[in-house]
């Protein structure tokens, strides 16, 4: 019999009820092409931390100067300050201190093209809107016009050549004059103001603008001020926090206010589909305090949707700290037969903010602001999380070999792709749902090696090792398997586990 790993993590069902390829544990693996591939490691952009706080905002901006030169800038927000990054030295320099922002903010931004140049507008909900136009003086500046005296814009969007702003903790939004993001043309109150407020603008298919409130979703109709009108899409869902939404495919994934689960939104109420309720039940593992909810972030990078959040067991059970410490990840191009994601859990990457660097020579790299220290991290350049081993664990479904007979398991074959260094991975098997450590062995995942100088190179592209079960722990009628590893420098892909079983005798019921 053959067990593959194509089904994703399912934590809401008993192991014996899981379907083909589903796993009761899948930690620090990505599911790709029907196999498990260890998640890439992280390495610091700035080896010297800015301090003991995290970084909730990372931005790579691209600008075209008058002489045609392309300028790339790295920006981070840390403890109220805006910093510029030096890609060569891996250091940060504080921008003009007169432009410092409120502490404990989570900045939001949009970019507007003006005369061929990109201008970044940044909002916190506590400060005046700041802008950065790629100037050679490395300065963020206060805006002019109506924005010079406005402190409560929390997020924004460019739509129909206008800047649209959300007023913090309010149902009021403002929109600018055409091609003039710093002067407000008018304001609109969306829905009822009592017990509700706007959280985030997004732009969907057909240049349709949506406003997610905390308890409802609205769509904008019309293309000129005289036609602008917001119509309710649904009042059964709302957005839990301003970073809890991300464009994915033909719609958006968002964190719902009411049950704290992820949903897909395609533009109508009937298009809304649950993404985590059936298999993950996010509300059971995520810290549900509003501070923790405000810290979530989402992104799509190289075909994988990633959702950073704080585990509710932070500070215990091996989940560190009072900060984002986990991610839920799935391959958006490889859904399950039901259309739902095949989730895996990433633990230890400690992500507070995402940033994809994808223009003018940047190689579509993912960088993240750490949630526990003042560093930003390159992803997929190393095999570990900033020098810390990545703890990998996968546990299969409970497979019934025979419904009415005891079987003898004669051998197990783990098939995978080895790494380039000599490592072992702990292999366990569990009989009849008894999760003990009796049936365990160490499996080498290095393959055969030849020494070339001081570098060991794997000389086989595949391992398919047979493991013999313990003789007095080889009879039962169901079995599951676990692989575990927590060593530095490990690389591995796992394709399947096969086992051979022979029926021995019928199961006898006992009565007392």
Where are these regions (language model features)?
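Hydrophobic or amphipathic alpha-helical targeting/insertion segments
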Residues: 109-143
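Short, glycine/charged-enriched secondary-structure capping and boundary segments
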Residues: 135-136, 178-179, 377, 381-382
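Glycine/Thr-rich phosphate-binding loops of Rossmann-like dinucleotide-binding domains
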Residues: 130, 173, 376
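Short strand-coil-strand connectors
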Residues: 79, 125-126, 168, 214, ...
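Beta-sheet repeat architectures centered on beta-propellers
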Residues: 1-91, 100-119, 236-252, 256-258, ...
């Amino acid at each position: 019999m053959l067990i593959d790993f194509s089904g994703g993590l399912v934590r809401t069902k008993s192991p014996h009820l899981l379907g083909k390829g589903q796993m009761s544990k899948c930690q620090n693996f990505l599911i790709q092409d029907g196999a498990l591939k260890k998640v890439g490691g992280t390495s610091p952009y700035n080896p010297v931390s800015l301090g003991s706080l995290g970084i909730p905002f990372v931005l790579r901006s691209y600008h075209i100067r008058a002489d045609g030169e392309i300028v790339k800038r790295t920006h981070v927000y840390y403890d109220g300050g805006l910093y510029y990054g030096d890609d060569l030295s891996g250091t940060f320099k504080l921008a003009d201190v007169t432009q410092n922002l409120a502490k404990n903010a989570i900045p939001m931004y949009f970019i507007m093209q003006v005369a061929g140049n990109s201008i970044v507008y940044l909002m916190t909900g506590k400060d005046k809107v700041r802008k950065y136009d790629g100037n050679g003086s490395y300065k963020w500046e206060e805006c002019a016009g109506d924005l010079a005296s406005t402190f409560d814009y929390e997020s924004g969007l460019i739509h129909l050549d206008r800047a649209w702003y959300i007023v913090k903790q309010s149902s009021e939004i403002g929109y600018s004059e055409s091609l003039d993001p710093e002067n407000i043309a008018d304001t609109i109150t969306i829905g009822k103001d009592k017990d509700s407020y706007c959280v985030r603008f997004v732009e969907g298919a057909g240049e349709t603008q949506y406003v997610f409130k905390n308890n409802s979703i609205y769509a904008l109709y019309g293309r000129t001020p005289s036609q602008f009108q917001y119509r309710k899409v649904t009042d059964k869902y709302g957005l839990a926090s301003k970073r809890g939404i991300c464009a994915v495919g033909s719609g958006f994934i968002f964190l719902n206010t009411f049950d704290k689960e992820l949903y897909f939104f395609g533009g109508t109420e009937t298009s809304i589909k649950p993404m985590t309720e059936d298999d993950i039940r996010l509300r059971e593992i995520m810290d549900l305090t509003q501070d923790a909810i405000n810290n979530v972030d989402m992104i799509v990078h190289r075909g994988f949707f990633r959702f950073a959040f704080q585990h509710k067991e932070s500070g215990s059970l091996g989940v560190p700290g009072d900060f984002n410490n986990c991610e839920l990840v799935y391959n958006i191009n490889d859904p399950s037969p039901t259309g739902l994601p095949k989730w895996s859990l990433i633990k230890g990457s400690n992500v507070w903010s995402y940033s994809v660097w994808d223009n003018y020579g940047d190689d579509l790299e993912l960088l993240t602001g750490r949630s526990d220290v003042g560093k930003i991290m390159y992803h997929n350049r190393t095999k570990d999380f900033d020098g810390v081993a990545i703890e990998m664990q996968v546990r299969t479904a409970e497979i019934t070999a025979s419904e009415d007979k005891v079987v003898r398991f004669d051998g197990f074959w783990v098939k995978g792709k080895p790494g380039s260094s000599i490592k072992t991975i702990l292999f366990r098997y569990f009989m009849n749902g008894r999760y003990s450590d009796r049936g365990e062995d160490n499996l080498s995942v290095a393959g055969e090696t030849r020494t070339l100088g001081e570098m060991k190179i794997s000389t086989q592209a595949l391992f398919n090792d047979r493991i013999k079960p313990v003789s007095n722990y080889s009879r039962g009628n169901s079995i599951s398997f676990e692989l575990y590893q927590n060593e530095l420098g490990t690389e591995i892909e796992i394709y399947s586990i096969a086992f051979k079983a022979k029926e021995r005798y019928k199961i006898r019921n006992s009565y007392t």
